[in-house]
């Protein structure tokens, strides 16, 4: 193999290694989460919000881990409904929240519920 061919092969291998490394970095980033505590004032209106958030959540790779259900609050106080949404990483969680699509949906949520939303990084 000529020196030019060896150099080209080395460059291709380095590119491939960089590609693999970037991929590993993406998969090893800590997950991002939205934790929401919600009091729903109008369940039919809140359903409109739930439908409106489907697209932005999907776009940013989110999945529901907790979506309502029974809960027990042994200390302090909490709203009636707890929602936990997982994102691939903290950046995706923040970008989804800041997205035009979600902000539009949030105006719907604000009409039909009162919520505390926290964005956190998991480990």
Feature locations, PLM:
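Hydrophobic transmembrane signal anchors and adjacent membrane-proximal interface regions, especially
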Residues: 7-8, 107
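Compositionally biased, low-complexity segments
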Residues: 5-6, 23
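C-terminal structural segments of small proteins and small subunits
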Residues: 94-96, 102-118
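Low-complexity, intrinsically disordered segments with a bias for serine/threonine
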Residues: 6-7, 14
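Serine residues within intrinsically disordered or low-complexity segments
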Residues: 2-3, 10
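Short S/T/G/P-rich N-terminal loop/turn motif that feeds into the first structured element of a domain
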Residues: 12-81, 87-98, 121-123
């Amino acid at each position: 193999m000529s020196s030019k061919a060896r150099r080209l092969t080395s460059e291709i291998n380095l590119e491939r290694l960089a590609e693999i490394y970037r991929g590993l970095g993406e998969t090893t980033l800590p997950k991002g989460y939205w934790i929401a505590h919600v009091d729903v004032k109008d369940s039919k209106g809140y359903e409109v919000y739930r439908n409106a958030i489907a697209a932005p959540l999907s776009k940013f790779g989110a999945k529901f881990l907790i979506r309502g259900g029974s809960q027990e609050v042994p200390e302090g106080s909490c709203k009636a409904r707890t929602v936990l949404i997982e994102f691939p990483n903290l950046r995706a969680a923040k970008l989804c929240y800041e997205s035009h699509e979600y902000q539009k949906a949030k105006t719907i949520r604000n009409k039909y519920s009162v919520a505390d939303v926290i964005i956190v990084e998991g480990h």
